[in-house]
């Protein structure tokens, strides 16, 4: 809701515990990089959406847009997509592309607690790229636990988000939330353990129906403070 209240075209999001006074030049460099990727993808997507609105969309243009959606955005189209008439294909592609966009920096997994980038299949059988927190995963399921243990990358929360559509209008971000992605977490307050139900998180369930692109960024951009001892690391020294 807070993000939805902003009027900005583009918003950068970073965890408050991932701030360092060192390596500023590198951090700025990769912020610009993921921002540039977002801008580049927006220009292509906006152009294709304008093409799809035209009455004379050719078979070749549909093919080009479909390949872009699959290869650049990693959108998974229905297996029988080609069997449908052009009108269906145009409407389907338009709906898939006319969404908020986020480019998410990911670092190599070095065992930090938290979520990561995964392929997810929802209740309707649709497969998409998502950021998934460990708390959302049933680690008692051997297959799921193995997928988590083999994960190559970790989510440092380093996102850039495009909040406006191809006409320059602000998206209603609440329309792109998966309300079924709330989950139960174990917490502790003053030594008392308890369980709590969390609503869809900002970068998982609340952005579940966004266009999502993952980009590897170097570990130098990730300097979390999870415990007091983390402040002793070089990244947090004067």
Where are these regions (language model features)?
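Conserved catalytic alpha/beta cores of large enzymes that bind or transform nucleotide phosphates
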Residues: 17, 21-22, 32-70, 148-238
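Short alpha-helical segments and helix-capping/turn motifs at coil-helix boundaries
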Residues: 1, 90, 143-145, 197-201
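Long insertion/accessory domains within large nucleic-acid-processing enzymes
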Residues: 141-142, 164
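Domain-scale recognition of functional cores that engage charged ligands
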Residues: 1-110, 119, 124-130, 135-136, ...
């Amino acid at each position: 809701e807070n993000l939805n209240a902003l009027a900005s075209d583009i918003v950068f999001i970073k965890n408050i515990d991932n701030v360092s006074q060192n390596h500023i030049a590198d951090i700025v460099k990769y912020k610009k990089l993921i921002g540039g990727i977002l801008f580049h993808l927006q220009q292509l997507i906006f152009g294709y959406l304008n093409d799809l609105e035209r009455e004379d969309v050719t078979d070749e243009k549909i093919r080009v847009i479909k390949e872009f959606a699959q290869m650049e955005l990693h959108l998974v189209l229905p297996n029988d997509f080609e069997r449908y008439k052009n009108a269906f294909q145009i409407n389907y592609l338009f709906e898939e592309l006319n969404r908020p966009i986020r480019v998410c920096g990911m670092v190599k997994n070095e065992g930090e607690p938290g979520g990561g980038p995964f392929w997810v299949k929802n209740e309707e059988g649709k497969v998409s790229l998502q950021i998934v927190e460990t708390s959302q995963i049933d680690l008692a399921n051997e297959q799921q636990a193995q997928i988590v243990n083999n994960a190559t990358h970790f989510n440092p929360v380093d996102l850039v988000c495009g909040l406006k559509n191809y006409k320059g209008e602000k998206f209603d971000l609440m329309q792109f939330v998966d309300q079924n992605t709330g989950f139960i977490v174990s917490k502790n307050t003053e030594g008392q353990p308890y369980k709590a139900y969390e609503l869809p998180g900002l970068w998982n369930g609340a952005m579940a129906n966004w266009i999502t692109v993952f980009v590897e960024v170097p570990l130098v951009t990730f300097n979390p403070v999870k415990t007091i001892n983390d402040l002793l690391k070089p990244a947090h020294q004067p």
